[in-house]
């Protein structure tokens, strides 16, 4: 083969290899394009199977499963309380990025439970945590994270600018209520699935405030209670009925000898029961029960096992306010079972220390101080704080009843400890009809932090 023939042969081979390579590249590009078109095309697909038509509605980035939480079930029968969650937020925050918070609470949809909390716009062990003992500031916000996780910038979702708040799920979306603004003109901003739907202006111009725990949803409507007026005297109390973020009805309670703040509410057989804080003149807790038309009844827990703090030693109770040590108070809760009542309270009668659950089988209607069950969850030597109720609907648990649960805030820092900040962690428990245990689940953080020295 002469040199010219060699050149022609080599050139021909190179040309064939090049053409094959080009065809393969074109095929690869076509394959990628087809695959991409399938993934990003119309997300409403209709398929035919055995002559039946099935339509799939795919919602990108969002779970499209929805139900209506009816709230028609009665509370589950229980014998005690099982530990549900503990976030250890202060302990983790000594080294990690954890928000300075207070007023945490828990609320559950039919799919998950979330911890909601009011941040101070600051992290633990950072200079901006200085002075966070203050309740109301423009830096506070309602945020949420998965239950049991320490609240950090990496796992938390912004909900609303707020220094007082509530939130609940109706089975189709989250309702959040965030109150912010000056003491003499605060505004509650209502959001449904993150979109502003309504606002409520302070009507007494004296620190509009709400529950600091979950609102309550029944048959697609959600209910909350707000207070406006003095914390040490008669104020104004309103119940709001809300549907998909819009107020459809409201009433003002006629309660001239009662004081309702920071109510802990739950659904029970289609009605709503709220147990609240009397900061005016009661060491027992006031309650209000209402139906979906906002027809209501009011009263006080009669038991001589008193639920507020400060409070007198247990003794003769009253179905009206017990005035001994009745001034001031702390957010709390109870669960009614017929004539009986589970009472959650601090173990100390003069400070926010310890926590216990007490079953008084006649305490809703009788004034004696006899009880049959006491379960300790935080020791007297450890700090506690606010507490509140939340429920797990049958749509979440698969039970045929409403599971009662509660949370306890574990406050740390100022004014009791030598720190520049005030924050808290949270523990929670749910009612079970099986074995439980007495123990203490304290916050457990070793103070002071580096920033405090």
Curated annotation (Swiss-Prot):
Virion surface topological intervals: 28-453
Membrane disposition: Single-pass type II membrane protein
Disulfide links within the chain: 76-401, 108-113, 168-215, 217-222, 263-276, 265-274, 302-319, 405-430
Cofactor(s) the protein needs: Ca(2+)
Glycosylation sites: 44, 72, 130, 219
Active site: 135, 386
One GO CC term on file: virion membrane
Membrane-traversing stretches: 7-27
Effect caused by changing residue 232 to D: In strain: A/WSN/33 and A/NWS/33
Post-translational modification: N-glycosylated.
EC id: 3.2.1.18
Localization: Virion membrane; Host apical cell membrane
Keywords: Calcium, Disulfide bond, Glycoprotein, Glycosidase, Host cell membrane, Host membrane, Hydrolase, Membrane, Metal-binding, Signal-anchor, Transmembrane, Transmembrane helix, Virion
UniProt binding sites for Ca(2+): 278, 282, 308, 328
Protein function: Unlike other strains, A/WSN/33 neuraminidase binds and activates plasminogen into plasmin in the vicinity of HA so that activated plasmin cleaves HA rendering the virus infectious.
Identification of the protein by name: Neuraminidase
Organism of provenance: Influenza A virus (strain A/Wilson-Smith/1933 H1N1) (Influenza A virus (strain A/WS/1933 H1N1))
